[in-house]
């Protein structure tokens, strides 16, 4: 059970960020491996749907542990889930956006190298920064804005001449991959800040909020699954192409999603940047060892700029873990 937000220790924050980093790096490499080695390619949409189901089941179990008794557990579900259609509707917004993001992420990674995907995905930082300013009434310092533009420059270098794998040859469509990652980035920025605002605007349990979001998420992803792959699924089956590696990827995605909600609840979206920077390094090293990735100079410089910008962005001059209620338009855009 996660501690109360007021009593969160530095160790707990570091623990969550460390686990989130390792899971993100492992997920990127493992997903890339399944997409390049599978003899029969599975449906990525079904994997996203199953991920939502697993996250829901884990959240239900954690809520039961948090409440401590069957009676309080039933009362909590009845009050906050079954008896709160308004709250379910509120949490359906990020679940819908996250569903789109997850599907776009699967599509992007199928058409991009693992390291390119991981670095390019960091465009969610400037998108998140803008959403934070507009939605949470926070201010960003000039140094933070500089780091945002530095990040854009780094990602541009990565896209200009991306690294190429030499040992694994896979038919890819980079244009489709970058288009999918752009949509995923926009979804990530909005949904992350929206969910943070919902979590920190009330004392409702984190696991209750997760259950509310994942319930609608299952409906959304299941509908999306049959809209995009319905005919093939009926012909080949829902679990077509599934292997132990695919289930491992789904498990990593589920754990990563849960830890992301914990990090957002007890720190903020800015702290997620540190995790992303470390994941870039780890996934790149893994790609070199496993896929024979050749790092070009432009890719290396771009990755370096991304890591430095994420570090600078994570050095705010103010407390960014709580929502400010008052801020002028000028302060929100420029900051001090």
From Swiss-Prot:
The keyword Transmembrane helix applies. Coiled coil: none annotated. Signal peptide: none annotated. One of its GO terms (cellular component) is Golgi membrane. It is found in: Golgi apparatus membrane. Transports CMP-sialic acid from the cytosol into the Golgi apparatus, functioning as an antiporter that exchanges CMP-sialic acid for CMP. Binds both CMP-sialic acid and free CMP, but has higher affinity for free CMP. Also able to exchange CMP-sialic acid for AMP and UMP. Also mediates the transport of CDP-ribitol. Monomer. This is CMP-sialic acid transporter.
């Amino acid at each position: 059970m996660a501690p109360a937000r007021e009593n969160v220790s530095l160790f707990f924050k570091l623990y969550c960020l460390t686990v989130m980093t390792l899971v993100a790096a492992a997920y990127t490499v493992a997903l890339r491996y399944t997409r390049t080695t599978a003899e029969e390619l599975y449906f990525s949409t079904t994997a996203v749907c199953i991920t939502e189901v697993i996250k829901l089941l884990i959240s239900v179990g954690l809520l039961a542990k948090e409440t401590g008794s069957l009676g309080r557990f039933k009362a909590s579900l009845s009050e906050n889930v079954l008896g709160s259609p308004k709250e379910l509707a509120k949490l359906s917004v990020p679940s819908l956006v996250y569903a789109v993001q997850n599907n776009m992420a699967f599509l992007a990674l199928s058409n991009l190298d693992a390291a390119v995907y991981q670095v390019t995905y960091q465009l969610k930082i400037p998108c998140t920064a803008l959403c934070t300013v507009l939605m949470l009434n926070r201010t960003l310092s000039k140094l933070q804005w500089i780091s945002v533009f530095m990040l854009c420059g780094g990602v541009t270098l990565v896209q200009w001449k991306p690294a190429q794998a030499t040992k694994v040859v896979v038919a890819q469509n980079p244009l489709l991959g970058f288009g999918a990652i752009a949509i995923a980035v926009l979804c990530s920025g909005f949904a992350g800040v929206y969910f943070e605002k919902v979590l920190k605007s009330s004392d409702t349990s984190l696991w209750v909020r997760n259950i509310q979001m994942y319930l609608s998420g299952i409906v959304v992803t299941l509908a999306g699954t049959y809209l995009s792959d319905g005919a093939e699924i009926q012909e080949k089956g829902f679990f077509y192409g599934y292997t132990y590696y695919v289930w491992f990827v789904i498990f990593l995605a589920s754990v990563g999603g849960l830890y992301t909600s914990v990090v957002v609840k007890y720190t903020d979206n800015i702290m997620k940047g540190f995790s992303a920077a470390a994941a870039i390094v780890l996934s790149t090293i893994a790609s070199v060892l496993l896929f024979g990735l050749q790092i070009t100079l432009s890719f290396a410089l771009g990755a370096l700029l991304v890591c430095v910008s994420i570090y600078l962005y994570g050095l705010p001059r103010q407390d960014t873990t709580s929502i400010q209620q008052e801020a002028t338009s000028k302060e929100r855009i420029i900051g001090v």
